[in-house]
Amino acid sequence: MSKVSGGSRRTRARRPMSNRRGRRSQSAAHRSRAQRRRRRTGTTRRARTSTARRARTRTARRSDLTRMMARDYGSDYRS
C-alpha cells in the first residue's frame, strides 16, 4: 500500500517508456556539458592569464637583451 502511494507511479504515467531513455540521456548530456564548461573556464582562465603574463615578461626581457646587444654590436645584430 505504501508503495502505491509513492510518486513513482505519477512520473511513469507522465513519461512513456519509449521516450524515457532519450530524455534522460539529453538531460544527462546537458548536465555534463554544464559541469565541463564550469571546470574548463576556471582552469583555462587561470592558465591563460599566467601564460600571457609569462609570455609578456619573456618578450620584454628578450627585447631588452636585443637592445643591449644592438648597442654593443651595432645595428646589424638582430634577434
Curated annotation (Swiss-Prot):
Biased region (Basic residues) positions are: 9-60
Q: Enumerate the sequence repeat regions by residue range.
A: 45-52, 53-60
What is the primary gene name for this protein?
A: sp4-a
Superkingdom classification of source: Eukaryota
Name of the protein in question: Sperm-specific basic nuclear protein SP4
- Primary location class: nucleus
Tell me yes or no: is Magnesium among this UniProt entry's keywords.
no
Q: Which GO terms describe its cellular component?
A: nucleus
Alphabetized UniProt keyword annotations: Nucleus, Repeat
The annotated regions of Basic and acidic residues compositional bias extend over: 61-79
Write out the annotated subcellular location.
Answer: Nucleus
Region described as Disordered: spans on this chain? 1-79
